Regions:
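STAS-like cytosolic regulatory interaction modules
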Residues: 1-53, 64-110
Length: 110
């Protein structure tokens, strides 16, 4: 299943919302979105994984690549409530690398 992608501006932030599965078959959607981020002028990028049902190592690699591209110039926040995606991120130890908030309200609060 390809993840559905949504993109929105929220103030000085660009929010990329993913749904479904982020895996080898669908990771190109995330890569394309991150490439658009490079030219969008947003001060901060949020990747919303709230509706992601599954993420594999390819998806995790894409998130790490996104961090490398985005962080030197702007902030990056993962929005990821308790669930399958967060558990995979934690098992991989990436919760120590990324700023993770459980929802958009918490991300707004900082």
């Amino acid at each position: 299943m390809d993840p559905e992608e949504g993109e929105a501006r929220v103030g000085h932030r660009l929010v990329l919302g993913l749904r479904g599965e982020v895996d080898l078959a669908s990771v190109a959607v995330l890569h394309a979105a991150v490439e658009r981020v490079r030219t969008c002028g947003a001060a901060e990028v949020w990747i919303d994984l709230s509706d992601v049902e599954f993420i594999d190592s390819t998806g995790l690699s894409a998130l790490v690549a996104a961090r490398r591209l985005v962080v030197p110039e702007r902030g990056l926040v993962l929005i990821c409530p308790d669930g399958p995606a967060l558990r995979v991120i934690q098992v991989a130890g990436l919760d120590r690398v990324f700023t993770i908030r459980p929802d958009r309200a918490a991300a707004h609060a900082g």
